[in-house]
UniProtKB/Swiss-Prot annotation:
This is Cytochrome b. The cytochrome bc1 complex contains 3 respiratory subunits (MT-CYB, CYC1 and UQCRFS1), 2 core proteins (UQCRC1 and UQCRC2) and probably 6 low-molecular weight proteins. Disulfide bonds: none annotated. The lineage of its organism: Eukaryota, Metazoa, Chordata, Craniata, Vertebrata. InterPro entries: Cyt_b/b6_C, Cyt_b/b6_C_sf, Cyt_b/b6_N, Cytb/b6-like_sf, Cytochrome_b, Cytochrome_b_C_euk/bac, Cytochrome_b_N_euk/bac, Di-haem_cyt_TM. Coiled coil: none annotated. Keywords: Electron transport, Heme, Iron, Membrane, Metal-binding, Mitochondrion, Mitochondrion inner membrane, Respiratory chain, Transmembrane, Transmembrane helix, Transport, Ubiquinone. GO terms for molecular function: metal ion binding; ubiquinol-cytochrome-c reductase activity.
Length: 380
C-alpha cells in the first residue's frame, strides 16, 4: 500500500513541498532565508493577533492601549517587543534574500522573482501602516508625510490624499483604516507567498553554480528540513535576545511621545529598513520626481531579469559584476545612513550621488559588465 502522505489529497501537497521535494545538493546557507521569512511571517501574525486583542484603534486611546499592553497584559511587553523587533528581522531576511537572488541570478525565474517583488511591496505597505498604530509623534508625522506624497499625482493628487485620510488631515478615520489594513495585509502576504512557492516548485531551486542540478538532487527532508531548523533556532535566539536585552534599540525616541498635530518633530524619518528608499526620495528636489524615484527604487528589481546580458547565470565566476554587486551593497548602506541624517550639506550631495549610483548600477553598469565578461570569455 502506498504511503498516506503520498496519496492523501491534502498531505500530498505538503509532502511535495516539504518532504519529497527534490533540492540541489549544494545550496548554501543563503538558501535558508526563504524559510526564515516564512517563520518571520508566522511569528508576526501570531504576535500581532495577540496585540490586536488588546489594542484600540482610536486616537484618544491608541497610545494608552499600547502602554496598557506593555504594563498590564500578561507578557504583553514581550509580545510587543517581539512584534516590533520581528519587523526588523523580517526586513533583514528580505534584503538578504533579495541579495542572494541578485548574486546567484535567481531572478531568471521571472514569475517567482516578480511575485517576490510584489511581496516586498506588500510587506513595506504593511510595515508602514503598522508603524502608525502606536500613535506616537513619529507615527503621526510619518503617516502625514508619506501619505502626502500622493498629492504629487497629477490632477487627482489632492482628492487621493483626502480619500486615504478619510478627512482633511490624518485623524481618527485614518488610524482606524490603517489598523484594518495592517490586520488584513499579512494574510494577503501569506496567500502571495503560496503563489511564490507554486512558481518556485515549477522550476526547482537555483544553486550557487548557476548550472542545471537535475543530475544531483537530494530530498528536502531530512537534509534541508534540519538545515532550516538550525536557521530557525539562530533567528529566534537573535530576535529574543534583542527583544529582551535592547528592545528599543531600533525605535525612534519621538515615538514615546503621544501624537501632537501642533508640534512637528525636528527630524521626521521612517524605521531604519526604509531609510535607503527615503534617502532616494529626498535626493530629488521635485516632489513628483522624488515619488517616482521612490517607487522605481523598488520596481527597478523587476527590470533586472530583462537587463541580464551574461551567458552565465550567477556571479560565482564573474569578478567584474561581483565587484559591482558589493558596490551596490555599500551604496545601499550609504543611502540608509543618509536617510537618517538631516537635510543639510554634505548629506544632500552624498545622498544624490548614492541615489544616482543606485540606479546607474542596476540599469547601466550591470548589463555592461555582463556584456564585457562575455567578450572576455570569447577572447580566451
Amino acid at each position: 500500500m502506498a504511503n498516506l502522505r503520498k496519496t492523501h489529497p491534502l498531505l500530498k501537497i505538503a509532502n511535495d513541498a516539504l518532504v519529497d521535494l527534490p533540492a540541489p545538493s549544494n545550496i548554501s546557507v543563503w538558501w535558508n532565508f526563504g524559510s526564515l521569512l516564512g517563520l518571520c511571517l508566522a511569528a508576526q501574525i501570531l504576535t500581532g493577533l495577540f496585540l490586536a486583542m488588546h489594542y484600540t484603534s482610536d486616537i484618544a486611546t491608541a497610545f494608552s492601549s499600547v502602554a496598557h499592553i506593555c504594563r498590564d497584559v500578561n507578557y504583553g511587553w514581550l509580545i510587543r517587543n517581539m512584534h516590533a523587533n520581528g519587523a526588523s528581522f523580517f526586513f533583514i531576511c528580505i534584503y538578504l534574500h533579495i541579495g542572494r537572488g541578485l548574486y546567484y541570478g535567481s531572478y531568471l525565474y521571472k514569475e517567482t522573482w516578480n511575485i517576490g517583488v510584489i511581496l516586498l511591496l506588500l510587506t513595506m505597505m504593511t510595515a508602514f501602516v503598522g508603524y502608525v498604530l502606536p500613535w506616537g509623534q513619529m507615527s503621526f508625522w510619518g503617516a502625514t508625510v508619506i501619505t502626502n506624497l500622493l498629492s504629487a499625482v497629477p490632477y487627482i493628487g489632492n482628492s487621493l490624499v483626502q480619500w486615504i485620510w478619510g478627512g482633511f488631515s490624518v485623524d481618527n478615520a485614518t488610524l482606524t483604516r490603517f489598523f484594518a489594513f495592517h490586520f488584513l495585509l499579512p494574510f494577503i502576504i501569506a496567500a502571495a507567498t503560496m503563489v511564490h512557492l507554486i512558481f518556485l516548485h515549477e522550476t526547482g531551486s537555483n544553486n550557487p553554480t548557476g548550472l542545471n542540478s537535475d543530475a544531483d538532487k537530494i530530498s528536502f527532508h531530512p537534509y534541508f528540513s534540519y538545515k532550516d531548523l538550525l536557521g530557525f533556532a539562530i533567528l529566534l535566539i537573535a530576535l529574543i535576545s534583542l527583544a529582551l536585552f535592547s528592545p528599543n534599540l531600533l525605535e525612534d525616541p519621538d515615538n514615546f511621545t503621544p501624537a501632537n498635530p501642533l508640534v512637528t518633530p525636528p527630524h521626521i524619518k521612517p524605521e531604519w529598513y526604509f531609510l535607503f528608499a527615503y534617502a532616494i526620495l529626498r535626493s530629488i528636489p521635485n516632489k513628483l520626481g522624488g515619488v517616482l524615484a521612490l517607487l522605481f527604487s523598488i520596481l527597478v528589481l523587476m527590470v533586472v531579469p530583462i537587463l541580464h546580458t551574461s551567458k552565465q547565470r550567477g556571479l560565482t565566476f564573474r569578478p567584474i559584476t561581483q565587484f559591482l554587486f558589493w558596490l551596490l551593497v555599500a551604496d545601499v548602506a550609504i543611502l540608509t545612513w543618509i536617510g537618517g541624517m538631516p537635510v543639510e550639506h554634505p548629506f544632500v550631495i552624498i545622498g544624490q550621488i548614492a541615489s544616482f549610483l543606485y540606479f546607474f548600477l542596476f540599469l547601466v553598469l550591470a548589463p555592461l559588465s555582463g556584456w564585457l565578461e562575455n567578450k572576455i570569455l570569447e577572447w580566451y
